[in-house]
């Protein structure tokens, strides 16, 4: 018996919508990364993007445990000398709540072209509205 290998043109991708209200950031991100990769499917193949599209709503209402709301730091560099910037979780949620989930999930995906293709299937929105109704997403309870 031969080993099954999924082909990119035959992979069936579904659309799912997830409500992040009250969900713990890391636990939510691991499940999102798993589904973006396609590891929940029987036809999973490591070198083929077999994952589904995920829409995350209410990113501003995601929860963290302990003192992470004030202690967790996010860093980025502007590219200029001495241009390291930092922001706490609270500041990130106030400024760009979508980025918190995007950063958490992106760190759990493979690095390289395949990981970038998987990351592009993640759509995160701060509020309760999204513009993907035409794709008829199914509600995914995590």
Swiss-Prot record:
It comes from the Bacteria. Pfam families: Ribosomal_L13. The keyword Signal does not apply. The keyword Ribosomal protein applies. SUPFAM superfamilies: Ribosomal protein L13. GO terms for biological process: negative regulation of translation; translation. One of its GO terms (cellular component) is cytosolic large ribosomal subunit. Transmembrane segments: none annotated. Disulfide bonds: none annotated. Keywords: Ribonucleoprotein, Ribosomal protein. GO terms for molecular function: mRNA binding; structural constituent of ribosome. Belongs to the universal ribosomal protein uL13 family. This protein is one of the early assembly proteins of the 50S ribosomal subunit, although it is not seen to bind rRNA by itself. It is important during the early stages of 50S assembly. NCBIfam families: rplM_bact. Part of the 50S ribosomal subunit. This is Large ribosomal subunit protein uL13. The gene is rplM.
């Amino acid at each position: 018996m031969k080993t099954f290998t999924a082909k990119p043109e035959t992979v069936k991708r579904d659309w799912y919508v997830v409500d992040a209200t009250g969900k713990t950031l890391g636990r939510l991100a691991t499940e999102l990364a798993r589904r973006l990769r396609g590891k929940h499917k029987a036809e999973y193949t490591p070198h083929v993007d077999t994952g589904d599209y995920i829409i995350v709503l209410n990113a501003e209402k995601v929860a963290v445990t302990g003192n992470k709301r004030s202690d967790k730091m996010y860093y980025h560099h502007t590219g200029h000398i001495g241009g390291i910037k930092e922001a706490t979780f609270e500041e990130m949620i106030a400024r760009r709540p979508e980025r918190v989930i995007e950063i958490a999930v992106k760190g759990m995906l493979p690095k390289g072209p395949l990981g970038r293709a998987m990351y592009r299937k993640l759509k995160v929105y701060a509020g309760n509205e999204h513009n993907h109704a035409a794709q008829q997403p199914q509600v995914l309870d995590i």
